[in-house]
């Protein structure tokens, strides 16, 4: 379906999943999780970004972000989180995209305004390294989505998502805001979460 023939919610969902695919790639590059040759400099929304080109890495990022399309369109997705773990699978850093798509918005979507707003997120990501934490060499990472309500059990796309087994922090996390935007029909925040300095060493499962 041509993007212009979609509802505003469908249009914004398509733009968002394309943006999230690039943003996740930039985050993973920023953290130095893979050799630089796994990425390639590209221009997206007139910003130079690092796009994953390693086949397995690129496929994982693409499938997880595009898999969110129908749920973002329906307003079901509350947060998309890139979580980095230590070897015990305990989260040590989270990049959180908290989003809300106005389901009653019926006006024509100005994609130029939306892309201008999203471009600012990518620019912020390129300079976010000083507020991040170094990662252990034996760690791991994943993309996790948090839903406002669960999709229907018979939803074929929903069956591609499985519950996460990530351990939880016992204390409220330390939050570092990176960027926020309110551009109807989209509201989105990007922030970092780190464990509290008083966090117990063995979080609950």
Language-model segments: which ranges?
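Long protein-protein interaction modules used by eukaryotic assembly/scaffold proteins
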Residues: 1-59, 64-205
């Amino acid at each position: 379906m041509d993007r212009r023939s979609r509802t505003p919610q469908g249009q914004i969902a398509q733009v968002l999943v394309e943006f999230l695919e690039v943003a996740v790639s930039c985050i993973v590059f920023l953290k130095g999780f893979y050799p630089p040759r796994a990425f390639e400099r590209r221009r997206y929304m007139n910003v130079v970004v690092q796009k994953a080109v390693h086949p397995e890495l690129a496929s994982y990022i693409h499938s997880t972000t595009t898999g969110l399309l129908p749920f973002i369109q329906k307003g079901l997705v509350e947060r998309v989180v890139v979580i980095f773990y230590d070897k015990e699978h305990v989260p040590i850093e989270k990049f959180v995209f908290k989003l809300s798509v106005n389901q009653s918005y019926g006006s024509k979507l100005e994609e130029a305004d939306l892309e201008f707003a999203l471009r600012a997120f990518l620019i912020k990501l390129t300079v976010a390294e000083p507020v991040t934490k170094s990662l252990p060499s034996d760690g791991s990472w994943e993309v996790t989505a948090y839903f406002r309500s669960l999709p229907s059990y018979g939803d074929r796309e929903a069956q591609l998502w499985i519950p996460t087994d990530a351990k939880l922090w016992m204390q409220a996390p330390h939050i570092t805001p990176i960027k926020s935007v309110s551009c109807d029909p989209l509201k989105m925040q990007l922030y970092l979460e780190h464990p509290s300095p008083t966090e117990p060493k063995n979080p609950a499962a």
